[in-house]
Amino acid sequence: ATLSQVAYFEQRHPTFRVDLIEASERSDYVDHILSWAADNISSGPIGVSTSVDVKSLKITQGKLGRQGAADLADRILGEVASGLHLLGVRKFVVAGGETSGQVMNALGVKQLAVAGFDELSGGYCHQAGTEPTSFVLKAGAIPKDDFFFIAIERMREADMRG
């Protein structure tokens, strides 16, 4: 489901597709992503995705190992989230349980206010404080292709309600 959701999102918003094999060979790969992000965030929501089709996944796992690929993807997304936060991003939609944990750790999130689940089954969360940050933490296979659009809109609505 996530792969089709990323493809749907990508039709209207810039999306960086992470190449884990390239990332494993470049020490500056996260900086490369953040440079791309800095050039694109002024236009609105952006995406950074490690999701790939089955064929590409097998190639990547063949080179990096299953756990190695997963760990690298989570580490990169955590570091990118931290860098995006430094660039002023305060709304994040994160897909996957392990990735969500990595992003929370990378951002130093210690406490969240959690809203109830709705028909999207997305975990809407907010971190209060001097730099309030909102999250939608997407569990596994939620079948709505427009999930990311709905999640972003829900965070905007929450901001307007205060």
Regions flagged by a language model, labelled:
Residues 1-162:
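Active-site catalytic microenvironments in core metabolic enzymes, especially phosphate/sugar-handling
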